[in-house]
Amino acid sequence: MGIMVGLPSPSGSEKDLQLNFGKNMTVQVEMRAPHLPAEWDLQSGIQLTWPHAGTDWAYMLKEVQECFVNIAREIAKRELLLIVTPEPEEVKKQIVATVNMDNVRFLRCETNDTWARDHGAITMIDTGNPSLLDFTFNGWGLKFASELDNLITGQAVKAGALKGQYIDCLDFVLEGGSIESDGMGTLLTTTECLLSPHRNGKLNQVEIEEYLKSTFHLQKVLWLDHGYLAGDDTDSHIDTLARFCSTDTIAYVKCDNTEDEHYEELHAMEEQLKTFRTLAGEPYRLLALPMADKVEEDGERLPATYANFLIMNDAILYPTYQQPDNDRKAGEVLQQAFPKHQVIGIDCRALIKQHGSLHCVTMQYPSGVIQ
């Protein structure tokens, strides 16, 4: 089955690219000026950076690899999957029985850790052509080793694992989990993370906003000043707190328990979200995700969150924590946000032991990047 491409007549300053994947599936791709896609825009595939014995997962390697296999299986049912690992042959043994190997690609590469969301390339699209922006990843503000992970994007482009124009942005520290795009020129982020002194400490908020607007061709940056999760290493990444689900919808973590340590900050975050406006000047439709019950490891509270879901072409993968009521409620909210998607829960209790979850270990790439 081939891919047939037809270009209709341009309309205004934009035109559409029609992709026909056989007789039953047609996708319209907007040929727009440079923009930062939304996560729900058409994807070619997802990156996972696989855990191995040289990572912080060594003490629970089998448990976390089982979680990665479950994520890989759901991805490869639907899209291409790029697995970054120093040991492709070993990973193949782990996944071959249950994962659609026709959709799996490997990049042999040394790695420090597994958080592809933060060391993966951030992709811009210009009239249908992808550009792969390679920012510095410095271990969330110099907290953890990152020298190998910081090289992955450059190696992936050089090896042809990622297709697109490589753009060196290594003079700026930025993690994918710290920004949310609506695909139309609005960015959602947190002051706690982007103003961290150990990231781009020489720049103030105005300068950082100007950099973001210039780099990503934005019209507006929405800064959340409130919201955090105990045990979080990222300085309040936005993908743990509030997520765009469409250009006018945001799903966010809501805490109803006044005795919970998060109550005041998450309530303040909710109130600030109510003040935000779309580019059309309208308030956002806000969908409240439940606050996960306390998850602890060795007496330490872990940053379990339902906001850390992954949007795919026809499915939503979201983390569950063996909390039946909360897991169910979160799935129902996400189904409301994405009525045409299949919503699939994946047990992420293993991931949260290293202070991350499902979205943190994945990075999606728009059409054409993974082939």
Regions found by a protein language model. Give the residues of each.
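N-terminal export signals
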Residues: 1-10
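The feature marks the mature, well-folded catalytic cores of soluble enzymes
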Residues: 21-371
